[in-house]
Regions:
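Multi-pass alpha-helical membrane architecture of UbiA-family
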Residues: 1-296
């Protein structure tokens, strides 16, 4: 008797599906988030072993995966109407809703399990963390500064990494958290999001969606973005000095801060693509300054 299975394993199909879903969650953004997480963890002190390093990385990956997939699900009907976002994978039919919900569930599960592996307080805070992340897409429906909500989402990464270094004692964890780095990171992301949202100025105004540009005008949005990014750059430098991270690392920190301010100038000129590329460099230079200061 010959028994055949209707289900076959095709490595090429599996690989193509994995690659497609990784594009859907923009995995490269997660990779650029990790250095800041590890920088915050090391500044918080405690014992960084392989176990902790791996699960901090997995927690970041899981949280961003859940957030990115839910953002696409929640914004589906808006993205269908916006010419700028009509090519997004869920809207374009390259990813199904079933897949999107599956990716969200997987990301949330990876995040919660990683938090549990890191300790008691990371697990307790996993629920509130997810709540902050999944409510972000609705912020622009409610008020004019969803950029601050996105900044908070990003700030959860260095904050969570710091708490993971002292997972059984929340008072010690909060006392050891590099708050200047956390605040600088929040302002960095919020400031750039103000710049990025200018591209949707007319669409947001027509559909009653909130952003600094839509509510207050382009000039005010430019001023807000520059203020946020300049403040962030200043805080990154002050953080370096407060922790006494030394001259060698200070060069990288100053370079990152300078690029951040320059990206703000480019953004106010409408050169968003160039500003975005500079921001990728900022996300590497600031942690590099910290790593160099700690170990060289």
């Amino acid at each position: 008797v010959h028994i055949s299975s209707s289900v076959s394993f095709d490595p090429e199909v599996v690989g193509a599906t994995a690659a497609r879903l990784l594009r859907f969650i923009r995995v490269e953004h997660t990779i650029f988030t990790l250095p800041m997480a590890y920088a915050a963890a090391l500044l918080a002190g405690g014992r960084m072993d392989l176990w902790r390093a791996v699960f901090i990385g997995l927690a970041v990956f899981g949280l961003r995966t859940a957030g990115m997939s839910w953002n696409n699900i929640a914004d589906y009907h808006i993205d269908k109407l916006n010419p700028r976002t009509q090519g997004r994978m869920l809207v374009a039919g390259k990813v199904s809703f079933k897949e999107a919900y599956g990716v969200f569930a997987l990301g949330a599960a990876v995040f919660i399990l990683s938090a549990a592996a890191l300790g008691w307080w990371p697990l307790i805070l996993a629920g509130p963390y997810l709540l902050v992340v999944v409510t972000y897409p609705y912020a622009k429906r409610l008020h004019c500064m969803p950029h601050l909500h996105l900044g908070l989402v990003y700030a959860l990464v260095p904050l969570g990494a710091a708490i993971a270094m002292h997972p059984e004692d929340i008072e010690t964890a909060l006392a050891k958290t590099p708050w200047l780095l956390v605040l600088a990171s929040a302002l960095w992301v919020a400031g750039f999001d103000v710049i990025y949202s200018k591209g949707d100025y007319e669409f947001d105004r027509a559909h009653g969606l909130g952003s600094a540009a839509a509510c207050f005008g382009i000039k005010v949005a430019d001023a807000v973005a520059f203020l946020f990014l300049a403040a962030s750059a200043t805080l990154y430098v002050v953080n370096h000095l407060v922790y006494g991270l030394g001259a060698a690392g200070l060069l990288a920190t100053l370079a990152g801060a300078a690029l951040e301010v320059y990206s703000a100038i480019l953004g106010t000129r409408g050169e968003v693509a160039r500003a975005f590329n500079l921001n990728l460099a900022v996300g590497l230079l600031i942690p590099l300054g910290i790593f160099t200061g700690l170990y060289i």
